[in-house]
Amino acid sequence: APMAPVEAAVRAVKELDVEIVLVGKKEVVEKELSAYDYPNDKISIANADEVITNHEEPAKAVRSKKNASVVVAANMLKKGEGDAMLSMGNTGALLASGLLIVGRIKGILRPALATLLPSAKGPKMLIDAGANTNCKPENLVQFGIMGSIYMKNVLGIESPTVGLMSNGEEEGKGDELTKETFPLLKKAPINFIGNIEARGVPMGEAD
C-alpha cells in the first residue's frame, strides 16, 4: 500500500534537503499524493506497473519483471538518477536487484542487511541481520567495516565501536567462525572492542 511511503516522502521533503522519486503505479501514487500539501519540485513519480510479492523467488522475479518498482528503482540508481534507494517491499527482491542490477562495491564479497536497533545509548547497528546464512571470517570483517563507515557518515559517530556477537566476552569464546574472525577484526581499520553478548546490543555496548 502506498500510504506510508507517500506520507514519509512528504515529511522528508519538508524536513530535509532532499528530492524524492516515488516509484510505483503512477495513478495510485498520484491519488495518494493529492491528499498532501508539499513542494511540487521536490517529489516526482516514476511509473512501474509490476509488483514482486513476498511469495515469489526473488532473483527470478527481478530478472523477469522488468517493470517492477524495485527493478525500475535499481536501474535508476545504477544510471546515476538517484543517490540512494529505499524499499518497503520484498527484502529478497531488494537484495537481488542490488546484486544483479546495481552491483557490489569493488572488493566487497557479500551484501549484508544492516538494522538500526534502539538501545539504552541511542540507535545501534546489527549487521548482518539476515542476508547470509553461512559466512566466512572475511565476510564478517567486511560487515564490520561497512557498518563502521555507515555509523560514522550517517549518524556522525567519529570512531564507531564494533563488537563481535558471541556467547561470552572473552577472546576465546564462541564457535569456530567467531574465534577465527576475532584476530582479523583486531587487525582491521576499525575501532574493534572485542566480543559482546546478545544482551550487549540493547545495552548499547557497541555502535
Predicted segments, located by residue:
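Short glycine/serine/threonine-rich phosphate/pyrophosphate-binding segments
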Residues: 1-7, 67-80, 84-98, 109-113, ...
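N-terminal phosphate-binding or glycine-rich loops at protein starts, especially the Walker A/P-loop
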Residues: 1-31
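Short beta-strand segments
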Residues: 22-24, 46, 87-89, 116-117, ...
